[in-house]
């Protein structure tokens, strides 16, 4: 099946079932179907009134597909630091006042893909990446997005819930310094501790020790958590409990801090789906990714968005460099110029 010719589609890599492609026409619904497959595709704000996208057909794709097409020519525009610097200053002011522990500004870089290439080719580049990443995509005739994320929001099987804290970033060659970096350790532990505190009232939670996850171009701290829930809940219950984790949201997480984060993201022109949950449901098994390491398009215009955690010990120069490092990593992941 040639993804480039499909006018609409949804794709995800499931941990046990591999690559799954949903084809249209899609039926959209506020509730999941009683049976059959469905994709959960929402915005970061969780404000899509019909986030369940129910495909007309579901296809299992081979792990080794066709090689990606030749690299397209993309004219990128470097993002200006001015708007980011203003948002960063406001965050640091709130952290100093004790109103915030952490927040995550996200800023896009824009580009134009030149014809005859089309952005749907990016999906083919996503599905050919390493086994430690999860490709995902959603597109219509004129717009869409796709990504290659290492981060899962959770995997629900009955009352069992598996999730992860993924925060703290460095280059692989800096691992010796990274494992002793107080700023990166603090950023990670805020995320892990927040997830643990949200899950603990729901049942029995086990947590692994913090470790380093090497993704080739970047390394991160990772902690895995497993919940045996006292009660059965719907996927949307867990989405609203866990999203956004402090890896992409604010800590403390309140209506006020989330509204402020939404304002910061809007001012930085962050795509609505960046960092949003992206999931797949079938037969009571729900697997949900965190929509990062992604590219968004309308027509031939692209947006490559990255975010980075800001805590009390953050500096503007360090955070701006980290955002560029992450953008370069996304481009390398897609093998783009």
Residue ranges and their predicted role:
Residues 1-12, 69-118, 122:
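Terminal domain-start leader segments
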Residues 1-43, 47:
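A generic N-terminal leader/anchor concept
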Residues 2-17, 107, 111-190, 282-307:
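An anion-binding catalytic pocket shared by soluble metabolic enzymes
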Residues 17-32, 51-59, 148-159:
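Surface-exposed flexible segments
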Residues 37-66:
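Small-residue-rich
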Residues 40, 98, 154, 193, ...:
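A residue-level signal for conserved active-site and pocket-lining positions in enzyme catalytic cores
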Residues 59-82, 87-89, 111-113, 162-264, ...:
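Contiguous alpha-helical scaffold segments within structured protein domains
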Residues 228-337:
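Conserved hydrophobic core element of enzyme catalytic domains
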